[in-house]
């Protein structure tokens, strides 16, 4: 039995044929399918092809059914390897997951960033994310006092 296919079109003009059952992990796409708006393909104006490829890879792996069984542990291990990406790609995936409304991918990408921050000082976080400190020493001290609970 062949699956129904739909075409996703990236913002840079590339088309990807994907099983509908895989694509509807995106609530955005699921609503378009429900509204019967997929005949000519689905343009995804906010997602470039290099990111759409990663989103599709994620959705294919997370499309679990009788034909594609996978244990929770194997899926978690796969997710960990999947997120071994450059920072810029992780941030682009966050934007795509949010735009496409794929909660599990949004949770995974945001948790990855949270793990990059956890246990670090403000200086280490700035270094990790290449953020310039534009506070004066006085402003920084005021913020520390205001949020002292966070530094305990």
Curated annotation (Swiss-Prot):
Keywords: Nucleus, Ubl conjugation pathway. Pathway: Protein modification; protein ubiquitination. It comes from the Eukaryota. SMART domains: Skp1. Expressed in young seedlings, cotyledons, roots, leaves, floral stems, inflorescences, pollen, and siliques, with a slightly higher level in inflorescence than in other tissues. GO terms for biological process: auxin-activated signaling pathway; jasmonic acid mediated signaling pathway; protein ubiquitination; response to auxin; response to jasmonic acid; ubiquitin-dependent protein catabolic process. Residues 94-152 are annotated as: Interaction with the F-box domain of F-box proteins. It is found in: Nucleus. GO terms for cellular component: nucleus; SCF ubiquitin ligase complex. Involved in ubiquitination and subsequent proteasomal degradation of target proteins. Together with CUL1, RBX1 and a F-box protein, it forms a SCF E3 ubiquitin ligase complex. The functional specificity of this complex depends on the type of F-box protein. In the SCF complex, it serves as an adapter that links the F-box protein to CUL1. Plays a role during early flowers reproductive development. Part of a SCF (SKP1-cullin-F-box) protein ligase complex. Interacts with ADO3/FKF1, COI1/FBL2, EBF1/FBL6, PP2A13, PP2B10, UFO, SKIP2, SKIP15, SKIP16, SKIP32, CPR1/CPR30, At1g55000, At1g67340, At1g78100, At3g04660, At3g16740, At3g61590, At4g38940 and At5g49610. Belongs to the SKP1 family. This is SKP1-like protein 11. It comes from Arabidopsis thaliana (Mouse-ear cress).
């Amino acid at each position: 039995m062949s699956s129904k296919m739909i075409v996703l079109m990236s913002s840079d003009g590339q088309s990807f044929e994907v099983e509908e059952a895989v694509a509807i992990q995106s609530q955005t796409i699921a609503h378009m399918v429900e509204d019967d708006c997929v005949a000519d393909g689905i343009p995804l104006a906010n997602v470039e092809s290099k990111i759409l490829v990663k989103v599709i890879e994620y959705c294919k792996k997370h499309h679990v059914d009788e034909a594609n069984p996978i244990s929770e542990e194997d899926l978690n291990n796969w997710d960990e390897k999947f997120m071994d990406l450059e920072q810029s790609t992780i941030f682009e995936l966050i934007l795509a997951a949010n735009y496409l409304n794929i909660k599990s991918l949004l949770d995974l990408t945001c948790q990855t960033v949270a793990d990059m921050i956890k246990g670090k000082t403000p200086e280490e976080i700035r270094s990790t994310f290449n953020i310039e400190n534009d506070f004066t020493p006085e402003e920084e001290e005021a913020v520390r006092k205001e949020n002292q609970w966070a530094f305990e």
